[in-house]
Amino acid sequence: MILIKNGHIVDPQNNLNDKFDILIEKGEIKKIEKNIQPFAGCEVIDAEGKIITPSFTDIHVHFRDPGQTYKEDIESGSKAAVAGGYTTVVCMPNTIPAIDDVPIVRYIIEKGEEIGLCRVLPSAAITKGRKGKELTEMALLKDAGAVYFTDDGAPVMDSFIMRKAMEYAGSLGTFVADHCEDLNLSQNGVAHEGEIAAALGLPPLPPEAEDTMVARDCILSIQTGMPVHICHISTKLSVEIVAWAKAMGAKVTAEVTPHHLYLTDEEFLDFSCIAKVSPPLRTHEDIEATRWALASGIIDFVATDHAPHAHYEKMQELQACPPGMLGLQFALPIVLELVKKDYFDLNRMVEVMSIQPAKKIGLKPPQIKEGEIAELTIFDPFETWEVNKETILSKSKNTPLLGRKLTGKVKYTFFKGKIVYRD
């Protein structure tokens, strides 16, 4: 048995936003009351000053397995996930080979279950080999356990293919998610087209490369009546397009990454390849737009786009180095900062970190409720910690946050009634 004492529980699903004790027996939440007395043989966790929420779900991570496990693998990725308070993650299909066949889908699920730290689920490719030419066998992949379809890392440039994919996935009760980038506009750009790129002489990547593809996908959703999900939305205009599409009745959802809520293109001022990400880091105006869109519900939830790369890969010259940065361990402190700055409250934080992403992939969100299996995150909202190579649990350490201090630290993560992470 485990008794969690004195923690402040936040779970809008059960109208909880107060200080309670939680008694967990054989993995199940037995009691949620004030002043539960400890007894012999019971592990007591003193959560005074801590916040307890349902554990988090991230529908967009890159665990690089199969094919690039020198960057990350399912075990190291799972360790990073639970250290960030996550108990469900969805792996992207830009592996080697791509997740476009049933055996690879099964491999991801079985490997995650074998490790057992968190729920590791696969997405599957929209097109074979992620080449944008021919649709995968979506029905077979979904039956094998793929939770949705995406060619993430690359857009679906062919609008006819994208329309057919939306119709096929929608008929199966799932959805497609698009990496919205018009390659004819982005060319080989590396930094947001603006003052910073111009001053540094960096190849510019215009925001229209994202905006036009977001508009296309939203229009296809309106016309077909089928759902579409916008990955890592990052521009003010894209936010406005999604708001318009939702007002038109489109079944469109959107995610935003922690780095697009927190970091700007000023990270390039030291010419650091660590700052290269796709879509690129944007301006303060774009960040402000995404923050308020997340608060209002135009953006539905947070997804980290956790993208590990080896040190030597990120030390190449800008055009050669791969885009991407870590995110799983930094999402909580970044989103929590928005709570502290009054963009939204803790209830909304739980919505965007836990409830809405779980619902999006058809899962019942974790709940803090008597009779439920404990899937909880306990964090200290005021603990400051340094991001360094020791505190990062991923194999790779590629983040512009190295050496910086963040406030908000996960102390315990419960998965299927067991403690899978303790700080």
From Swiss-Prot:
Keyword match Hydrolase: yes
Keywords, sorted A to Z: Hydrolase, Metal-binding, Pyrimidine biosynthesis, Zinc
Catalytic residues as annotated in Swiss-Prot or TrEMBL: D305
Annotated metabolic or biological route of this protein: Pyrimidine metabolism; UMP biosynthesis via de novo pathway; (S)-dihydroorotate from bicarbonate: step 3/3
Chain positions recorded as Zn(2+) 1 binding sites: H60, H62, D152, D305
InterPro entries referenced in this protein's UniProt entry, alphabetically: Amidohydro-rel, DHOase, DHOase/Allantoinase_Hydrolase, Dihydroorotase_CS, Metal-dep_hydrolase_composite, Metal_Hydrolase
Entry-linked CDD domains: DHOase_IIa
EC number assigned by the record: 3.5.2.3
Reaction(s) catalysed (UniProt annotation): (S)-dihydroorotate + H2O = N-carbamoyl-L-aspartate + H(+)
Note on cofactor: Binds 2 Zn(2+) ions per subunit.
UniProt record, GO biological process: 'de novo' UMP biosynthetic process; purine nucleobase catabolic process
Cofactor(s) for this UniProt protein: Zn(2+)
Ranges in a coiled coil: none
One function term, GO molecular function aspect: zinc ion binding
Entry binding sites for Zn(2+) 2: D152, H179, H232
A GO CC term assigned to this protein in UniProt: cytoplasm
Chain positions recorded as substrate binding sites: H62, F63, R64, N94, H309, P323, G324
Function field: Catalyzes the reversible cyclization of carbamoyl aspartate to dihydroorotate.
Similarity field: Belongs to the metallo-dependent hydrolases superfamily. DHOase family. Class I DHOase subfamily.
Entry-linked NCBIfam families: PRK09357.2-5, pyrC_multi
HAMAP family xref list: PyrC_classI_B (MF_00220_B)
Name of the protein: Dihydroorotase
Taxonomic source organism: Sulfurihydrogenibium sp. (strain YO3AOP1)
This protein's encoding gene: pyrC
